[in-house]
Amino acid sequence: MYEPNVVGDWQEYDEHAGLRVRVHGLHAQEPPRGRDAAAEGLAYFSLRVTVENRGPERFGIHLEDGQLDVRIGPDGESAFLDWRNSQFIEGYDIYPLRRATAVLFAAGPEAALARVDIQVHLRIDEEWADRRMWSGGLGLQEDGTGPAAATAHEGLACQVSNFLRGQAEEGTA
C-alpha cells in the first residue's frame, strides 16, 4: 500500500534513476505581490516543491498549474491556490547534480491549516510520473531537530498511515 510522505521527506522516482522530489518549507506567509481578492478572510501559506537530479542524465521537468493539489483540514477540502503569486517549473532541463524549486502560495481557513495534504503530479520528459503525496500542517517543524519535532513528525506520519491502513482494511473486509 502506498503511504504519503511527511512534508520535508524526499521521494525517489524508481523509473527515473537519480530523480527525487521533496515538498518542504510549509509555513504561514503573505504572497509577495499582494493578496488575491478571492482569498479575503483566509490565512495564506506557502510551500516549496524541489526536484533534484542525482543521476547521470538530464531530465526535462514540468510542474505547472493543475499538477499540484492542496487539500486542508480533516475533510480534505481544496485550498485556494494563488497562481498569480506562485512560481512553477515550466519546461526546465535538470542536469546532473542540479535542483529546481517551485513556490506555491495558497490560502484557507486558519483552523483547517493544522492538516495540509499536497499531491504532486510531475511530468518528466513528456511522460507523467506517478502521483505522490505529502502530509503536514502549519505549526509542525519539518527539519526534525529536537525531540518535539521528531514527535510531531512521527505523530502525523503515524496518524496518516493508520488512517490509510484502516481505510484499506475496510475496503477488503
Regions found by a protein language model. Name each.
Residues M1-A173:
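Conserved functional micro-motifs across diverse proteins
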